[in-house]
């Protein structure tokens, strides 16, 4: 005769439930990275979208606090209570992802990337918090320390700061690009002024030169003959520095045009400007790195050509877009001419290396 007593479902111990949830959240990350916007016949309601996203972020932040409060010290909650808490975390995380998917592509790819990155930071932050909590009791971690430093709370608090339209998103990304190139330009200028690109690194190492003189090769430090520019190198650096300066000027001008003339509904053109401008900073970095001794002139030539190609394309895309109401303005042709002049000079100085 079958027992009339209902079977009690088996629940894994709290530790296993948290570990499983962390793995589950990690598995969501690739899906969020490549996820497409949901197709819907309903008209997009921007105000409702941002309200839902902010509310979802607040919910996740609250669940992070609940997790921290219950699992940062022993005794842990029962398996049943752990199951309930984990389910609330799942629901909160799923809501963030669902809201992100509800943002249509026609609102702008740049804006969608910012919202996607925010969602990724939140999911990743929650997974990190779970992983920290798995070891917290044995390390006697204080609740206050966990709450103040867990990255999911930081990510949630950043959600209200996300730009609300594609023009604002484009300006944010262009500002970041300007700042990155500004830093690279200033770093390069300082190295040129000091004529000693490895001054900080080598000064530190020279203090221990007696005991570590044989270790330079192992540590990757440049030997003395490779730590300074030759006369040929210094001559080549001049047009390279001018090219980086032109990159900075171009990005600043593009950002100004977008700020003054950009239209929120011209999302495709704004996305194109941001996409090509995003390539400038990495190309500048490659060029700056290539001029550190020992300098390979062929590498400098290749890095310069790549940067010039990206720069001219960015200027041409900007000139052809709605942010340039007067395409005949002279600043774009002037910048293109300056860039071409730099490249021609670099080609002349690296011709021998190219022929080898």
Swiss-Prot record:
The keyword NAD does not apply. The modification N-acetylalanine is found at residue 2. Residues 2-181, 147-356 are annotated as: Interaction with TCF3. This is Cyclin-D1-binding protein 1. InterPro entries: GCIP-like, GCIP-like_N, GCIP_C. Phosphorylated. It is found in: Cytoplasm; Nucleus. Expressed at high levels in brain, intestine, muscle and ovary and at lower levels in heart, kidney, liver, lung, spleen and testis. The keyword Oxidoreductase does not apply. Residues 2-205 are annotated as: Required for interaction with CCND1. It comes from the Eukaryota. Belongs to the CCNDBP1 family. Residues 198-224 are annotated as: Disordered.
